[in-house]
A protein has these predicted regions:
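Middle-to-C-terminal accessory/interaction subdomains
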Residues: 1-149
Length: 149
C-alpha cells in the first residue's frame, strides 16, 4: 500500500531563489504509487476509504479535517481531480496507449517468468477508473461529513 503511511516525503529549498517552488516552504510529495490504480487487483471497486484511513493514522491531517474551510477546500480539490484529471474515459484512453507500448515487452516477460497478464491488469485498472469518482464522493461524505455534487 502506498499511502498514507508509505512513499511520502516532505521537501523544501533552504534559500529563496525566486522560483515558484524555491521559496523555502515545506511541500508534500507522494511517489511510487502503483497501488493507486489497482494494478495488483487488490481493490477493484475502490471501496477502501484511504481518506478515513489517513485521518485515523495522521493526527495533523485529522486536525486539519476538523476545520470547515480546509474540509471544503479538500473536498473541492478532490472533486476537481475526479472531474478533470481522473476522468474515466480519458484515463482509459491513456492506459490503452500505454498498454499498447508495453504489451510486447510484457509478453517477453511472461515467457521468461511465467506470469504477467497485461490484459487482466488493464481490465482491473479500467474497472477501478470507472468506479473511482463515485467512490471519491462516498469517501468525502463518509470522512468529512460533506455532501458533494
Amino acid at each position: 500500500k502506498d499511502w498514507p503511511d508509505n512513499n511520502v516525503q516532505l521537501w523544501r529549498t533552504r534559500e529563496d531563489d525566486g522560483s515558484d517552488y524555491g521559496d523555502t516552504k515545506w511541500r508534500y510529495m507522494l511517489y511510487d504509487t502503483e497501488y493507486s490504480m489497482n494494478l495488483w487487483g487488490q481493490d477493484n471497486n475502490g471501496n477502501t476509504n484511504r481518506l478515513q484511513e489517513a485521518r485515523n493514522k495522521d493526527a495533523l491531517f485529522d486536525a486539519l479535517c476538523k476545520n470547515d474551510s480546509f474540509k471544503q477546500s479538500l473536498a473541492d480539490t478532490l472533486m476537481d481531480l475526479a472531474d478533470k484529471n481522473f476522468k474515466s474515459a480519458d484515463a482509459a484512453k491513456k492506459l490503452d496507449a500505454m498498454a499498447a507500448v508495453y504489451r510486447p515487452l510484457m509478453e517477453q516477460y511472461k515467457k521468461r517468468f511465467g506470469n504477467g497478464d497485461v490484459d487482466s491488469r488493464v481490465r482491473d485498472m479500467k474497472s477501478f477508473m470507472a468506479n473511482r469518482k463515485s467512490q471519491i464522493k462516498k469517501h468525502i461524505q463518509e470522512s468529512l461529513s460533506i455532501t458533494v455534487k
